[in-house]
Structure formats: C-alpha cells, structure tokens
Amino acid sequence: MAQAFCLRHGEMKPLLTNLPKRSSKPRQTGITLVIDKGLSVAEAENLLSVAEPYIDFIKLGFGTALFTQNLERKLTVYRNSRIHVFFGGTLFEAFVVRNQFDDYLRFLEQNKIEYAEVSDGSFRIPLQEKCEYIRNLARHVNVLSEVGSKSENSNATPAEWVEAINSELDAGALSVIAEARESGTVGICRSDGAIREELVLEISKHVPKHKLIWEAPIKDQQAWFIKSFGPNVDLGNIRPDDVIPLETLRSGLRYDTFATFAPMTERPPEPSKMIVEELADNRSHIGTPQFTGNKSVSDQHAKSS
C-alpha cells in the first residue's frame, strides 16, 4: 500500500498520523472492484501506473470482452499487477440464454480466466438453477455471484435478497456482489441514487460482511458505505478515474468522510518545539529575506522610484 512519508531526523515517518488502517494486497477485506468498460491496453497500463496498489478486481463490464482488441494483452497487464480479472455477468447470461454454457466454459479456459461472475440481472434464472450453475462453475474457477435485478421495477423483499445471497454462497460462490449497475440506480439503490438503507442493513445482519461486495459507483454511495461499515468495506463498480478518490474517502481525506476519521480537537495543537526547530533549520539553508528597519518591501520600492 502506497503512503505519503517524510524524512524526519533520519527516519521515514508517515506524513499524516491517525489515518484509518487500510488492508494491503492481497486483501481479504477492503476490496475495490473496478469496472472496465473498454479501456485500451495503454489506458489499462496508465491506470495501473497510478492506482495499482488500490485495485483488487477488474471486471470487463457486460459483454465488452467480445469486442476488446488485444484482449489477451490486456488480461496479461492486469494479471501482472496481481489483479483478479473477470468478465461481466451479463456475458454469462448471454451464453446461458442461448444454451451455450459449454461454450462459455471454453471461452473462460481459452482466456485463462480464474474468476467468473454468475448473475441473473438481465433475464430471470430460478434460484435453484442459478445455484446449479454456480456449483458447476466452481469446479473450474472461483465464482462471484451477483444478486439483484437490473430493472428499476424489481420488488424483491429483503428476505428474498438474504435467501438468494446465502443460497449462492452455500452453492460455492466466494462472495456475492449486491447489484446497483454502473448507474447506481437499481438494486440496493433507488432510482435517484440514494441507498436503500433498510435493505442494506437487513442484508448485513444476515450475511458475513466479508462475503459482500456492494456496488457503489457514485461518490455519495461510497461515502455512505464507508461511514456505515468502515474504511475496509468491499465496494464494486468503481470507475477507473474514481479509484484514487475512493481511497481518499476510505482514509478520511475528502470532505465526505473527513469528520468520520479525523482525530478532532477543539483547537489545533501548538507546533512542537522540535518541528519549530526543524523549520528554522530549513529556513537557514535557503536564506532569510532582508528588511530595512520596519519598512515593507512595497514602501522601499515606492521610495526608490
């Protein structure tokens, strides 16, 4: 995990103290799952050059894997950075609805994919049948299942969400992704982007938190989850350009979570004598401004002109 450090009295010290403790890769909690909707190889490399320490999973969204040029090269770029990559669940559904599940397995094998997402957001798969797909896939790859419809008209109850999540975990899913889409307006979210708080809290009562990845593509949603479940909550559908902003939210270095994690005091502490001495030493090396009496620079300039 990259952090900002400064050299003080010959030792490297964290630049900021009392930051929330963040997990490091390979993580079991605090996962950030990024959605790639068609990045080029160069764009993938650029993303990792600045954000690799903070990314755990990358999903090639919906069916984009079928249209990605240099797919093998991009997959290699991600794997070389210790990032788990998988294809969006909609692609799984596209194979299943055409009765091509065996072709899907071959496609995963051909691309050396070690994780697969099983979802039923675009067309309904009965829970028992979906669990059978999970059991089948789990014999070949690591399975992430996704629960929740992509339709705004879905009216599944909290009890139905909990039943589906626990059934899919029992069938062999490593974790369950709670649906919100890349728009953040369905599933665990309302059409205006607000979190369905009662639903989320009810799910969290009955499912281990480390088994849940909450889709939260919008900043306010991310902040809500971090304030509700802590800096190491697992979040998904994060846009590539939001990876570092999300890390600042997790660390309390953005307004939305600043007060949650800052060691607030009534007034800023007085600078320590040691720091004052360091500043004085640094100033002596770069020189000090020269003044004539108590006159300001502008006064001196006016007189000379």
Indicate where each model-derived feature is located.
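Acidic (Asp/Glu)-rich catalytic clusters
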Residues: 45-53, 68-82, 103-112, 132-140, ...
